[in-house]
A protein has these predicted regions:
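Conserved G/P- and acidic residue-centered "switch" motifs that form tight phosphate/ATP-binding loops
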Residues: 61, 96, 156, 185, ...
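Active-site PLP attachment segment
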Residues: 172-208, 231-234
Length: 369
């Protein structure tokens, strides 16, 4: 048996020879950044692929989150989830905004709409939910609350590339949706991100903000930032799109393999989507409860001892980090579900190049424990 390490994820890389022609075009144009032809082509291609009207590319998803908040002039307090990558809440603090944590739904692991309303104060200006693992939030319930209280909704959709509900792209919901194209994501540009914009006017403001606030050669209208994606990153994205169908199909097959092999394992719960969603299978999280022979951490270590490097996404909670734990909303009593899930979760390896032999190594450990 091959004992080569198996990591929780691995970037999808198309054949190198297919990337060379894109690089040759960049060398010939001598345009490396500032909205060059590759950048413009990728924005258009993503609009078509995702079924959205306007895409603003960024150099990474965190800068995109920061800029989205600036674009909507969000201030005060924003209700968000503690169960996410730290960039979600960091983007708020960097904008001088106070995160207010609300608990998550025990089934979807997304922000629980029934907990949002109680967290609203006169200082609340927005809600920032996360489509965790690419599973859509209850967008209708969240939007209803936002409408009732005149709040903005910015979705951290870092996990949700290509995800659709019955009406189309999940990215069409809220005021803005923010994507990450980091190397670990199902669609990557090495580093990168994007904001999905509802209209041309909003995209224009976002494009200005990501270019230091410039509107022309001599006019600056806002304190912007350098959030521009380079031509090399955009070119890689164009090539990646050509391979997405094959990569997504392989992820779907791996997801099905895990579900079939683990369905009889007592003490393991697989996180399911809504059932009305076109999923991207970006992660494969399981929850390890008291009926499993090993604790979550013991299973995590056993996998590691066998060369399988799963991850405890998301542990610890954002609310446990020093810059957040002193906040009233970060208290464990306010977040019982999120704390329980964080103590149980393991994400198993999932990426297109995984072989059946490697997958069987993973499932055998869970079956035999």
């Amino acid at each position: 048996m091959n004992n080569k390490p198996v990591y929780v994820t691995q970037p999808y890389l198309p054949p190198l020879e297919e990337f060379i022609p894109y690089l040759q075009q960049i060398w010939e144009s001598k345009v490396l950044t500032n909205g060059g032809p590759m950048h413009e082509q990728l924005e258009a291609a993503l609009c078509d692929y995702l079924g959205v009207e306007h895409v603003a590319l960024f150099n990474n998803g965190t800068i995109a989150l920061l800029t989205a908040l600036q674009a909507l002039r969000v201030t005060g307090e924003v209700i968000t989830t503690p169960y996410s990558f730290v960039a979600t809440s960091h983007s708020l603090l960097w904008n001088g905004i106070r995160p207010v944590f609300a608990d998550i739904d025990p089934l979807t692991l997304n922000l629980d709409p029934t907990k949002i309303e109680a967290a609203i104060t006169p200082q609340t200006t927005a809600i920032m939910p996360v489509h965790c693992y690419g599973n859509p939030c209850n967008v209708e319930a969240i939007q209803k609350i936002a409408d009732n209280y005149n709040l903005r909704v910015i979705y951290d959709a870092a996990h949700a590339f290509g995800v659709e509900d019955s009406g189309g792209s999940i990215l069409r919901h809220g005021d803005l949706s923010v994507l990450s194209f980091h190397a670990t994501k199902v669609f990557n540009t090495f580093e990168g991100g994007a904001i999905i914009c509802p209209d041309a006017r909003t995209k224009k403001r976002i494009d200005q903000l990501k270019n230091f606030g410039y509107v022309d050669e001599v006019t600056v209208v806002a304190p912007g930032i350098n959030g521009k994606m380079s031509e090399v990153n955009a070119a890689f994205g164009l090539l990646q799109l050509k391979h997405m169908s094959k990569a997504m199909q392989r992820r779907r097959e791996i997801d099905q393999f895990y579900r079939e092999e683990l369905k009889e394992v007592s003490g393991i719960r697989m996180v399911d989507g809504t059932g009305q969603t076109t999923a991207n299978h970006s992660y494969f999280p399981i929850l390890v409860d008291a009926n499993f022979p090993l604790s979550r951490d013991a299973l995590y270590q056993k996998l590691k001892d066998h060369g399988i490097f799963a991850r405890r996404y998301f542990y610890p909670l954002i609310s446990e980090f020093p810059m957040y734990r002193g906040m009233n909303s970060a208290h464990r009593s306010n977040l019982p579900i999120a704390n329980d899930v964080a103590e149980q979760v393991i994400c198993l390896p999932i990426y297109p190049s995984l072989s059946i032999e490697q997958l069987s190594r993973v499932t055998a450990i869970l079956q035999e424990s």
